[in-house]
Amino acid sequence: MASEIYRRLPMELPAQHLLASLALVGALLSVGYLLLRPAKYQLPLPPGPRGLPIIGNLHQAPKEKAWEVYKQWSDRYGPIMSVNNGGMITIIVSSHEVVKNFLEKNNAVFSSRPQLLVLERALYGFTTPALPYGEKWLKHRALRGAVLKPAMAVRYRGLQDLESKQLLRDLLYSEDFTQCMRRQAASLFLGIAYGNRFPEETPEIIDIDQAVAQLGGISESMFQGTGMLREFFPVLKYFPGYDKFLKQLDDVGERLANIYVRRFRDGLSTPAWNWAKEYSKRPEAQGMGELELSFCIGSTYQASLTPYEILRIILLAAICHPEEKARLQKEIDLVVGKDNLPGWEHKDRIQFVQAFIYEALRWHAFSPLGAPRAVSRDIEYKGYFIPKGATLVLNQWAMDHDENVYDNPFTFRPQRWIDNPDLPHVIFGFGLRGCPGQHLARDHLFINTARLFWAFNFGNAYENGKKVELDLDELMQPRGGGSAFNQVPSFKASVIIRSSERRQIVENEWDAVEKDEQKILAEAMPLPE
């Protein structure tokens, strides 16, 4: 659904209006940069592909699979390189070593965001992940940290357990595993955030999904074609066609605002504990209005769907690598047995589950370029100048396919993570901008991966008695705009319970589990500080 919406969004400005502004603004930016650059920083920028006068490397901007193009460039120019987008510098990092020895050690320098004018307008300047480093972002971060810290993730396990058991039972009666898993992820977030879970897909879930998909289309448009130029050259707002674009932004922003505020008010009135109530009473919320608090919570929804996307990657990896899937099930059965569902007590005992998750994400990165960061002050690295205001991009796909770190990086081999537990990964980012919900996400991925493969065999689907082969080339093609996210499109699979005994256990566990969200969320309420 999301990818279809992306393709229907007309986000491009007329190309004939770009050249004049590019020539003028690009020249001014380039000359100004050279004239105002401090004398003490007469060091070269990191190397990169040679550009053209004025526009730099804009004509070389990849139209799809940017991470692979950047990997080819990094093989030539090194693990840290620069590109010039008409006077605006982007630093691209393709090495775990640079992340560890430079970025993490200078965390404060790389913890801001570029000023994204499009998102700022569409989201009223209240969407936490897009905020630059500053007082507002620190308050938002403190609010999220209060409900997403490790101790809180443990307290959400009651709701995780319920949603996981419903997913298993739903799969006994439905062939649409994608819809079942998406409902689960949405219901988990809506339950924690607003105090009401959704046992079935409802118009409320569809409405927020469609609005978030529209936002995703706008986000993708900023990193490709003339969409990139809107961010780099705000002067384009004076050209014909911009009013139509602004109308689209305002429509999406208004739609999201209505959804988020409505859900926020519902959360305040529901009997169960939830984030809306918790945020409202915390000292960090002093001075925040209803709209800002609503966006602070609501903007987490898109991130909450990431584990759902990752589970689909895990299922695809298992179907494409049946020998590794068989070992995964063997390891789960060895630790858990056939008479009980995997539980939290098994988390540290089934090492192969975590290894399989890490390898699936290395094999097919969901966010291969991560979210862009902004450099907050001039800094030097190994004789290269990294200027304040530059955009920082982490090529996570290149890092995950680095031959110097991973032996045979294009081979799917979960055992590598057991042989070397210290292998690096950037699944959840790093530093102050690391994913605040990673502990909740890790629990979600473990309990669902372990239980799904304990209960079911996943394999190729059959139609009219013929096996449906998966076209990996097609499935690996980027979706969305191909810049920030690499969602796996819908694919067919067979979902077969492993035995009648396991089917009965799934049914019994569902019948016995506590389903009253008010009781479950009472256990999630934070302890007094």
UniProtKB/Swiss-Prot annotation:
Annotated Gene Ontology cellular component terms: membrane
Swiss-Prot/TrEMBL cofactor(s): heme
Membrane topology: Single-pass membrane protein
Cross-referenced InterPro entries: Cyt_P450, Cyt_P450_CS, Cyt_P450_E_grp-I, Cyt_P450_sf, Cytochrome_P450_fung
Residues of the signal peptide: none
Pathway: Alkaloid biosynthesis
Transmembrane intervals: 13-35
Enzyme Commission designation: 1.14.99.-
Record flagged with keyword Transport: no
Consequence of gene disruption: Abolishes the production of okaramine B and leads to the accumulation of okaramine C.
GO-annotated molecular function: heme binding; iron ion binding; monooxygenase activity; oxidoreductase activity, acting on paired donors, with incorporation or reduction of molecular oxygen
Keyword terms, alphabetized: Heme, Iron, Membrane, Metal-binding, Monooxygenase, Oxidoreductase, Transmembrane, Transmembrane helix
Main location: membrane
A Pfam family recorded for this sequence: p450
One GO process term, biological-process aspect: mycotoxin biosynthetic process
UniProt xrefs under PROSITE patterns: CYTOCHROME_P450
Function description: Cytochrome P450 monooxygenase; part of the gene cluster that mediates the biosynthesis of okaramine B, a prenylated indole alkaloid that possesses an unusual octacyclic ring system, including a four-membered azetidine ring and an eight-membered azocine ring, and that exhibits insecticidal activity against silkworm larvae. Within the pathway, okaD likely catalyzes a key step in forming the eight-membered ring of okaramine A using as substrate okaramine C. The biosynthesis begins with the NRPS okaA that condenses two tryptophan molecules into cyclo(L-Trp-L-Trp).
Protein's UniProt name: Cytochrome P450 monooxygenase okaD
Organism encoding this protein: Penicillium ochrochloron
Upper lineage: Eukaryota, Fungi, Dikarya, Ascomycota, Pezizomycotina
Gene assigned in the entry: okaD
